C-alpha cells in the first residue's frame, strides 16, 4: 500500500512540512488543480512553534494534503487516541498512520483564546467584529510570486490598525497556498 509520507523539521519560529508522494496518491485530483510544491512553511516571531500539539500539526497536515492522499497519510509523530478516533469518523477515503503509541490529547485551557484567519477584507473584518474581544486576528502573509497581481499592502495596513486599536493582530509568513 502506498501513501503520502510527511516529514517535519521545526525550530522555535518555523515549521517546515515536506511531502513525499507515492504511486497511489492523487497528483491531479481534478483537471483544475494539482499538487504544486512538495513543501510548505510557517514562520512567526511571536510564538514558540515547538509547543504546538501533535494533534494540531496532524490536523494541519490533513487539511493540506486531503485532496492528494491515495490510501494512507503517514505522519512522522505520535497523535492522541481521541484525535485518531475523531479522524476515523470523518475520513473515509484514506487512513492515517502515526508513529508509535498514543500521546495525551490536547487539553483546552481557559487561558486559550480564539483566533481568526484574517484576510484584511470586509468579510474577515465583519467576522472579527462579532468574535469575542480577545480574538487574535492572524494574517497568513504569503509570498508574492513573480507576475502576480496580489498586493498584501492593504492587509498589512489593516493589521497595523488593528494593533493600534488594541487587537493582537499577527502576520505569519506562510506559503501553504502554493502546495
Region locations from a protein language model:
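Intrinsically disordered, low-structural-confidence terminal and linker regions
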Residues: 1-5
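ATP-dependent adenylation/nucleotidyltransferase module used to activate substrates
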Residues: 7-74, 78-179
Amino acid at each position: 500500500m502506498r501513501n503520502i509520507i510527511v516529514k517535519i523539521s521545526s525550530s522555535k519560529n518555523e515549521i517546515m512540512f515536506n511531502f513525499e508522494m507515492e504511486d497511489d496518491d492523487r497528483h491531479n485530483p481534478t483537471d483544475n488543480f494539482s499538487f504544486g510544491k512538495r513543501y510548505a512553511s510557517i514562520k512567526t516571531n511571536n510564538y514558540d512553534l515547538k509547543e504546538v500539539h501533535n494533534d494540531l500539526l496532524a490536523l494541519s497536515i490533513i487539511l493540506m494534503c486531503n485532496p492528494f492522499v491515495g490510501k494512507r497519510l503517514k505522519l512522522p509523530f505520535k497523535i492522541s487516541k481521541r484525535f485518531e478516533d475523531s479522524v476515523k469518523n470523518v475520513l473515509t477515503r484514506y487512513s492515517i498512520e502515526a508513529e508509535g503509541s498514543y500521546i495525551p490529547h490536547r487539553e483546552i485551557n481557559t487561558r486559550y483564546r480564539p483566533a481568526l484567519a484574517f484576510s484584511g477584507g470586509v468579510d474577515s473584518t465583519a467576522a472579527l467584529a462579532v468574535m469575542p474581544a480577545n480574538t487574535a486576528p492572524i494574517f497568513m502573509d504569503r509570498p508574492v510570486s513573480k507576475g502576480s497581481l496580489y498586493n498584501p499592502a492593504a492587509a498589512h495596513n489593516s493589521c497595523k490598525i488593528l494593533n493600534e486599536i488594541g487587537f493582537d493582530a499577527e502576520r505569519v509568513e506562510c506559503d501553504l497556498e502554493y502546495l
